[in-house]
Amino acid sequence: METATLVXISISGSLVSFTGYALYTAFGQPSQQLRDPFEEHGD
C-alpha cells in the first residue's frame, strides 16, 4: 500500500476510537461519576 493510504487509515481509526471512547464516557458506565453543575446550583 502507499504511505498516504496507511496514514489516512490510521488517522481515521484514531478518530473513530476517540469518538467511541468519548461517547462511552459521556453516556456509558463512567457517566454515573460525572457531576452536574446545573444540578448543584440551586436558585
From Swiss-Prot:
Location within or outside the cell: Plastid, Chloroplast thylakoid membrane
Annotated keywords: Chloroplast, Membrane, Plastid, Thylakoid, Transmembrane, Transmembrane helix
Pfam families associated with the record: PsbN
Encoding gene (name): psbN
Record function comment: May play a role in photosystem I and II biogenesis.
Recorded family membership: Belongs to the PsbN family.
Top-rank taxon: Eukaryota
Transmembrane region(s): 5-27
Biological-process GO terms, alphabetical: photosynthesis
Protein topology in the membrane: Single-pass membrane protein
HAMAP family in UniProt: PSII_PsbN
Full protein name: Protein PsbN
Organism: Calycanthus floridus
Claim: Thylakoid is one of the keywords in the record: yes
Keyword Thylakoid: yes
